[in-house]
Amino acid sequence: MVTQILGAMESQVGGGPAGPALPNGPLLGTNGATDDSKTNLIVNYLPQNMTQDEFKSLFGSIGDIESCKLVRDKITGQSLGYGFVNYSDPNDADKAINTLNGLKLQTKTIKVSYARPSSASIRDANLYVSGLPKTMSQKEMEQLFSQYGRIITSRILVDQVTGVSRGVGFIRFDKRIEAEEAIKGLNGQKPLGAAEPITVKFANNPSQKTGQALLTHLYQSSARRYAGPLHHQTQRFRLDNLLNMAYGVKSPLSLIARFSPIAIDGMSGLAGVGLSGGAAGAGWCIFVYNLSPEADESVLWQLFGPFGAVTNVKVIRDFTTNKCKGFGFVTMTNYDEAAMAIASLNGYRLGERVLQVSFKTSKQHKA
């Protein structure tokens, strides 16, 4: 496939940059970039059978790559059709956009753009939908909501055993105003084939007031506990990470900052104390993968607490080193809240790691 890709490049880009890519896709980019994001690209509409090596080979032909990741489904391992590339040189990133944007690969026309920084107009555009007919497909749900704006991602939650829809879904729009219009138009309405009205509301992100309270607590805690040369850097990491969680802000620091045990320690006061690490009790058990070796239980409390009642968290540690083995478990009492947490945190970037979050199955690691 690599040979075919390079051949396609030669035939398509000889006359200059290709035309615009298709208008809809899983994630967003921007035609411009801030000084801190001129090396980080998002690539949409990749062929599903494209491998990580082929993805790296394609973009590595432009210049030196710091990192690249083809995003895959956490369960099936199949490509989700998009990925991220971070170049060493901003000029190479710009060249990749001019050279590869609009490149046709198999039946796809790829879109290459700068990873879009957050802004008020695009934040919090994720909707939670309940009461959907069990027979409604993801495509039908998208058709229902597409009249209100551009849909970025959609998902219908299914039973892990039977594969049957739970009647709960998520829709992420391009802009918040589109999500607001969808709520006005569809909340309380009966779609075709529905016996009951559906509920459409914003996914349960922490409110601005809650976020501000967290920030205040965090700064007070850090001021008491840390001083010296590390204080400012640690404080900045905490602020960035908390903003990322509370407001959906994806600032450059969160993309490159290493996961710091010092920073996490400062968050422990926000999550409560007296955590026990035994087996999960009654409720919905969530599997969290790709945690840092330095991660502890306070990380999981801090991540999942804003979505609802958490009864237990557990980080699985190596017996010899006492370091996190890369995964842990969270138990939440309410299914809808657990589902919202999964939909919001799966793919969440924590430090340099992208978390994989799903309902626990028998195939996954056991505590």
Curated annotation (Swiss-Prot):
GO terms for cellular component: ribonucleoprotein complex. Residues 39-117, 125-205, 284-362 form the RRM domain. Gene3D superfamilies: 3.30.70.330. GO terms for molecular function: mRNA 3'-UTR AU-rich region binding. SUPFAM superfamilies: RNA-binding domain, RBD. Keywords: Developmental protein, Differentiation, Neurogenesis, Repeat, RNA-binding. Brain specific. It comes from the Eukaryota. RRM 1 and RRM 2 bind cooperatively to AU-rich sequences in target mRNAs. RRM 3 binds to poly-A mRNA sequences. Belongs to the RRM elav family. RNA-binding protein that binds to AU-rich element (ARE) sequences of target mRNAs, including VEGF mRNA. May also bind poly-A tracts via RRM 3. May be involved in neuronal differentiation and maintenance. Plays a role in the stabilization of GAP43 mRNA and in spatial learning. Interacts with MAP1B light chain LC1. This is ELAV-like protein 3. It comes from Homo sapiens (Human).
